[in-house]
Amino acid sequence: MINTLSILIPTYNNVCVELVKSLQAQASLLYSSSDSLSSISHFEYEILVADDGSTDERTIEGNRIINTLPHCRYIERKENVGRAAIRNFLAREAKYTWLLFIDSNMNVISHQYLANYLKEKESDVVYGGYQIKRDAETRERLKYNLRYIFESAGTQNGNHLQRQANPYADFHTSNFIVKRSILLKHPFDERFSHYGYEDVLWGKTLKNNHIPILHVDNPLGYEHF
């Protein structure tokens, strides 16, 4: 059972205050009620948001409110080091045994999101997947967006059983839990300084080192295309 958790959010030119507030509200409830829950005892958490050298000053200023939230810290970094290096940095900064990595452009769609992860068996890596918003307004707004059309047509990212059939290939860094010791021993390859592929290579690293990935049905929402 997971009872200590560092929630780690890398961000770049994106205000993620609402995401952090949603996560903090769930974590705070678990923290305050942990003594009375038979399945979760002495729950401790932190939420760290690392700004990877954002160039938009309004974005940086907007995210500074995160520092006023309990158990939350907004870390401003001047240099843009890329998706792999910023995740490795967050892992080093974290103080708890388990790390939950979330992309800053995701949104929480379940009130039980954190509780679902805490109840999972202690697999070294657990991936929850993501869910594309498919309401009428979003479909109309993005009807000519090729990436949205492609992602919406797919189902495997929302179906954990299909993902589990090919666990290392169907893995993304947008929503997963990992033991801190695993990531420190097998960090992301920092040669990937731009968008993409760091999760593909890390999946291969896990496979080569016989570290299993458990796929579960615990998605975050995604609508930024």
Q: What do the PLM-derived regions correspond to, one by one?
A:
Residues 5-22, 26:
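A conserved hydrophobic helix/loop-capping motif in glycosyltransferases and polysaccharide synthases
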Residues 23-76:
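Acidic donor-binding segment of Leloir-type glycosyltransferases
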Residues 77-94:
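Glycine-rich, basic loop-to-helix element that forms the pyrophosphate-binding segment
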Residues 99:
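Short aromatic/hydrophobic "clamp" motif used to bind/position activated sugar donors
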Residues 111-143:
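Conserved donor NDP-sugar-binding/catalytic core segment of glycosyltransferases
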Residues 146-168:
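Short, flexible, basic/aromatic active-site loop/helix in glycosyltransferases
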Residues 193, 211-225:
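Active-site donor/metal-binding and catalytic loop motifs
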Residues 195-202:
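Acidic donor-binding loop at a coil-to-helix junction in glycosyltransferase catalytic cores
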